Regions:
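Short conserved micro-motifs at the rims of enzyme active sites and ligand-binding pockets
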Residues: 27, 194, 216-220
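Catalytic core of non-heme Fe(II) oxygenases with the double-stranded beta-helix
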Residues: 101-180, 201, 205, 215-223
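Short beta-strand segments enriched in hydrophobic/aromatic residues
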Residues: 127, 187, 209-211
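A short coil-to-beta-strand element that immediately follows conserved catalytic motifs
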Residues: 87-99
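Non-heme Fe(II)/2-oxoglutarate
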Residues: 1-88, 110
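Short beta-strand His + acidic residue motifs that chelate non-heme Fe in jelly-roll/DSBH
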Residues: 111-114, 189-197
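Long, compositionally biased interface segments
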Residues: 213-235
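Short, proline-centered helix/strand-breaking motifs
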Residues: 182-186
């Protein structure tokens, strides 16, 4: 008997190392005070632990002249992801729309599940990862191989014989210092502590990238974003 198996529609996460990481790490620490923020704040008497600086009004690390070369490297790796890995045409300009700090200073400082709904590709560049740092975790939202709710997701008892890429409902990466992780912005993700024995500061620069058609393109695609050159802003 002949059987055929087609594993279709994978989701691709791209991990690379940033060349000259120490140089860029040192450069960031020189400007770190400009982007620092209160890790713990209080609102209506309730304590809030802020694991990112995204909502502090300063998500513009990519505009810092001292870090221009770093972000050029990130864009270069993103082009590899788009053109060489995903095999799309070279028809886009890439725009970093915002960038911010992701930071944990205690084992229980986790970032909850979320996605970056306003961009196409998101990145996380790991400046510092002490031993037992939090992992970056992704969710298989469509989860069609789950067959029915709970078969591969139950926290009490699931039906998975051995977890693999075909039946997994989640996947995590233990980022190394100096690594760059690129992934589709629409992917649900979070950070998760896998050890109580965590000390120090897990620190990353996180950002969003939007693809727009090249300025000199034909503009004959019905989907996607036209280059900002052709937009008009109303206030």
């Amino acid at each position: 008997m002949t059987r055929h198996i087609f594993n279709i529609f994978p989701t691709t996460i791209y991990v690379s190392e940033i060349f000259n990481h120490k140089k860029y790490k040192d450069a960031f620490y020189k400007v770190y005070p400009k982007y620092d923020y209160e890790q713990v704040t209080y609102e209506d008497g309730e304590e809030w632990v802020n694991t990112t600086s995204e909502n502090t009004g300063n998500p513009f690390i990519h505009l810092d002249d001292e870090l221009e070369e770093l972000f050029e490297n990130i864009i270069s790796e993103t082009k590899v992801y788009i053109h060489e890995v995903l095999n799309y045409q070279d028809i886009f300009d890439l725009i970093i729309t915002k960038s911010w700090i992701s930071r944990s200073r205690a084992a229980d400082e986790n970032i909850p599940w979320h996605k970056h709904s306003t961009s196409h590709i998101s990145f996380s560049y790991y400046l510092n990862t002490p031993p037992n740092s939090h992992v970056l975790k992704f969710a298989n939202i469509s989860n069609l191989n789950g067959l029915f709710d709970g078969l591969n997701t139950s926290d009490i008892k699931d039906g998975v014989r051995e977890s693999n890429e075909l039946n997994a409902s989640t996947f995590h990466i233990n980022p190394e210092e100096g690594s760059l992780i690129l992934f589709p912005s629409a992917m649900e993700h979070c950070t998760e502590s896998h050890s109580d024995d965590f000390k120090g500061e897990r620190l990353a620069i996180v950002g969003d990238i939007t693809l727009v058609y090249k300025e000199n393109g034909d503009n004959d695609y019905s989907m996607g974003f036209i280059n900002p050159k052709y937009r008009r802003t109303y206030k």
